[in-house]
UniProtKB/Swiss-Prot annotation:
UniProt-annotated catalytic positions: 161
Keywords: Cytoplasm, Mitochondrion, NAD, Nucleus, Transferase, Transit peptide
Domain notes: In contrast to class I sirtuins, class III sirtuins have only weak deacetylase activity. Difference in substrate specificity is probably due to a larger hydrophobic pocket with 2 residues (Tyr-105 and Arg-108) that bind to malonylated and succinylated substrates and define the specificity.
EC nos: 2.3.1.-
The name this protein goes by in its record: NAD-dependent protein deacylase sirtuin-5, mitochondrial
Positions annotated to bind substrate: 105, 108
Family membership: Belongs to the sirtuin family. Class III subfamily.
Claim: Cell membrane is one of the keywords in the record: no
Molecular function in Gene Ontology: histone deacetylase activity, NAD-dependent; NAD+ binding; protein-glutaryllysine deglutarylase activity; protein-malonyllysine demalonylase activity; protein-succinyllysine desuccinylase activity; zinc ion binding
HAMAP family registered for this protein in UniProt: Sirtuin_ClassIII
Keyword Glycosyltransferase annotated: no
Pfam families associated with the record: SIR2
Length: 315
């Protein structure tokens, strides 16, 4: 068993102990049947499952924010200057060139501050609010660091990778919300994505600092973020993996299923016979394991899927 699988399993077991639950076994026949089945694109069938579900987990990835105009930094052309995002989002990259890493995240902050939640974000928030009045629970697990779900009104949310708008002191570890743009004067006008743009080479003393201690600040990127892999087992300590055990309906929205840890949740849920619906513009390596797959822009498919079902209580 890999370290990543072990960490996820450990968190799942921790949650189940706290809830007084036991992990149900995965039947081998169930595995085979799920793997061999083809996902359905019948929206009416999906909505019948949706109408009966009491605990709904919605997992979102870069695709849903891409429809708001946010670069995904994945796939062909997914570069900032000449760098891949994953090459910059590491402790090693930050230690070697903190100026370059801060330029990259300054660019991302500037882009996101000019964008807005789209129809998919709004539909998810409206669904959560509506179902909560019916005694049903919706939780959103997002890989995105743009806070669009929160801006759209979602309340019950786990930000697996943290936020571009929280900073952490390198010395005391405290975290603060920071929407200043630029986050420090030295980053004004920096971070251009053009491959020919020169590196700013900002002196260390001019990079973001914690006001009270004077120590350096870094973006508070959580859990499985490559920049802070040590937070995997302590940030949002139990919520996301637990949902793979107690949810009775899962939705996979605009995510490639390749990014850990979220990439493991959908298959884990599906192997326990829980209906999982994938909403994406493309199929993914695990699409065949899911009960449903809906192809198309999330801003179109999600509002339809999450709209009130005729059987819902209205009063």
């Amino acid at each position: 068993m890999s370290l990543l699988h072990f960490a996820t399993r450990r968190l799942i077991l921790q949650v189940l102990r706290e809830l007084g639950l036991k992990a149900p076994p995965v039947h081998k026949t169930l595995k085979i049947c799920i793997a061999m089945s083809r996902p359905s694109s019948n929206m009416a069938d999906f909505r019948r499952f949706f109408a009966r579900a009491k605990h709904i987990a919605i997992i979102t990835g870069a695709g849903v924010s891409a429809e708001s105009g946010v670069p995904t930094f994945r796939g062909p052309g997914g570069f900032w200057r000449k760098w891949k995002a994953e090459d910059l989002a590491t402790p090693e990259a930050f230690a070697q060139n903190p100026s370059l890493v801060w330029e990259f995240y300054h660019y991302r902050r500037e882009v996101i501050l000019k964008k807005h939640p789209n129809a998919a974000h709004v539909a998810i928030a409206a669904c959560e609010e509506r179902l909560s009045l019916q005694g049903r629970r919706v939780v959103v697990i997002t890989q995105n660091i743009d806070e669009f779900h929160t801006k759209a009104g979602t309340k019950n949310i786990l930000e697996l990778h943290g936020s571009l708008f929280k900073t952490r002191c390198c010395s005391c570890g405290n975290v603060r919300v920071n929407y200043n743009n630029p986050i420090c004067p030295a980053l004004e006008g920096k971070g251009l994505p053009d491959p020919n743009a020169p590196d700013a080479q900002i002196p260390l003393e001019n990079l973001p600092r914690w006001k009270t201690t004077g120590d350096f600040s870094v973006l508070f990127l959580l859990d499985a973020s490559p920049l802070y892999p040590s937070n995997l087992s302590c940030s949002h300590p139990v919520g996301a993996p637990a949902l793979s055990e107690v949810a009775d309906l899962g939705r996979w929205v605009g995510t490639s299923s390749l990014v850990y840890p979220a990439g493991m949740f959908g298959p884990h849920v599906a192997l326990r016979g829980i209906p999982v619906a994938e909403f994406n513009t493309v199929t993914t390596p695990v699409t065949q394991n899911f009960r449903f797959h809906f192809s198309g822009l999330c801003g179109t498919t999600i509002p339809e899927a999450l709209s009130p079902h005729e059987s819902e209580k209205t009063g």
